[in-house]
């Protein structure tokens, strides 16, 4: 069972439908016990970083996520959920993140030929093969964001060209992040979610 974390700031239902489509049993929950017992979790997110992090902390889910990461269970952050995995953000004001992947969230450069927010389809360039990227090569995915993950190159597994090379996917051990929306990216998004399903299966096998 995989849990999609519900903290009133994410597109949980569309992610759940995508997981149903690939045959991955899932549940939307904000219950800390259910989340801790899950085989893997997805952290969605839309909106502003400070409010999202505040809500996670208020519910005690920041500690739960860190415990899950320490236990080696897979985590996938989507859009703002990916950004929350990093150490901090300067959106509106400095805010500490979960610190599960090194890096800092910054606003995209405001240049006349590159609109902010970055919205729509953009090509994904694979930098490192992982279970989530092994079946994709140069396809297009769907983005909606104004901030990006400024993190060390070693943790970036895919990028998309814009005013800068945007880290489209990041990874640290069993922790993954997608800046774009896999659940809105058609077949390629489903392939990425299938890759996360494989990570969960592999982790369960190794823990038995």
UniProtKB/Swiss-Prot annotation:
EC numbers for this chain: 4.3.2.10, 3.5.1.2
HAMAP family: HisH (MF_00278)
Annotated GO MF terms: glutaminase activity; imidazoleglycerol-phosphate synthase activity; lyase activity
Pfam families: GATase (PF00117)
Residue ranges of every copy of the Glutamine amidotransferase type-1 domain listed in the record: 1-206
Main location group: cytoplasm
One Gene Ontology CC term in the entry: cytoplasm
PROSITE patterns linked to this entry: GATASE_TYPE_1 (PS51273)
Residues of the signal peptide: none
Function text: IGPS catalyzes the conversion of PRFAR and glutamine to IGP, AICAR and glutamate. The HisH subunit catalyzes the hydrolysis of glutamine to glutamate and ammonia as part of the synthesis of IGP and AICAR. The resulting ammonia molecule is channeled to the active site of HisF.
Subcellular location: Cytoplasm
Protein's name according to its UniProt entry: Imidazole glycerol phosphate synthase subunit HisH
BP-aspect Gene Ontology terms: L-histidine biosynthetic process
Keyword Lyase among UniProt keywords: yes
Keywords recorded for this protein, A-Z: Amino-acid biosynthesis, Cytoplasm, Glutamine amidotransferase, Histidine biosynthesis, Hydrolase, Lyase
NCBIfam families: IMP_synth_hisH (TIGR01855)
Reactions accelerated catalytically: 5-[(5-phospho-1-deoxy-D-ribulos-1-ylimino)methylamino]-1-(5-phospho-beta-D-ribosyl)imidazole-4-carboxamide + L-glutamine = D-erythro-1-(imidazol-4-yl)glycerol 3-phosphate + 5-amino-1-(5-phospho-beta-D-ribosyl)imidazole-4-carboxamide + L-glutamate + H(+); L-glutamine + H2O = L-glutamate + NH4(+)
Organism of origin: Listeria monocytogenes serotype 4b (strain CLIP80459)
InterPro entries per the UniProt record, alphabetical: Class_I_gatase-like, GATASE, Imidazole-glycPsynth_HisH
Source species, domain of life: Bacteria
Record pathway: Amino-acid biosynthesis; L-histidine biosynthesis; L-histidine from 5-phospho-alpha-D-ribose 1-diphosphate: step 5/9
Active-site feature positions: 79 (nucleophile), 181, 183
Subunit structure of this chain's protein: Heterodimer of HisH and HisF.
